[in-house]
Amino acid sequence: MKELNEEVSRKLELIRAALTETGATGVRLKGTDWFAWATAGASNTVLLTAETGVAEVLVTIRDAWVLTDEIEAQRLEDEELSADFKLHVNPWADAAARESFVRDVTNEGKVLSDVCDKAKRLRPIPHVEKRLPASLQHHKRVMMSSELERYREVGRKASVAMTEVLSKAQPTWTEYQLAGAGAEALWARGLHPALTLVAGERRLPLYRHATATGEAIGQQAMLVFCARGYGLYANLTRFVSFGSLGDERAELHRHVREIEAQALNLCKPGTSLDAVYHALAQAYEQHGFPNAIREHHQGGTTGYLAREIVANPTTIDTLSEGIPVAWNPSLPGAKVEDTFVILQDGTLENLTFDPNWPSVEVEGRLRPVPLELT
């Protein structure tokens, strides 16, 4: 018999507090991110590139449902959902039946919905569905202890997959082959390869967001993962060099590690994201690269999205205990990125650290260096 989930029960309390706060009669959560959050890591994903899934959560003051169709219902009930949710099933060809059900159980009142968020392409029903309050959005960004345990698992698996793939890579591989090997290693560990960026030797200095091509990687390559498990994203970047990296390239990597350290040093409860951005801008300038901050975003908070909030000069959102972050400072041909979480004592835990990957200490933290294969 299915059991109730303590984490889900707590989240239903938070959702119902949002109902009380706003005077709404229901909350609909359709995005892959919000569905995973509300269900303690369940997935409504079928199409990996979709921002909304094949099921949604509906919560009223009294009840909590998962709404889906006849195609998905049995699998979701058997494999994904706890006993906290009732299941409402509509015919796959009759989407109007679901909307009628929602109107009935919410007494045709105001409904809050995550599809008002900028990340979602679906639009809410005009004059009925409203944006989720900031209080609930904040709760989604702060990890509970049970979420953090799942996050550690995702981060560990993603980092081990990265090490495995780059350790066996060959300079004759195409960028497609390296991206495919990365995706395979993630799938083998039960993680979605939400993003696998690859740049080989020629393209590395040219593009920050290097989507893979059929070109051979040559003497060095960058591999980037945004790996999703339980709805949580582990974000990391690593480099491999076939033979010695060389002094000039090694110096670029040193610069980005030291620039990143300024961001990590500020990741404490109460720090605003714009303060971190400005610290990074200053660090780039001090290292002799004043325009580099304009060439790529620098990262921000992460969690149920690869980036929940991207830091910019005016981002006033503040960090707190339990918020995960992923910064990604870069220069032409060099970048550093891992996923961290702010702990109760204000320190950072690296969720994507692999002790088998080469590293150096930077301001008290072990940070990755390119893997040199001979």
Where in the sequence are the language-model features?
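Active-site neighborhoods and metal-handling regions in enzymes and metal-associated proteins
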Residues: 1-374
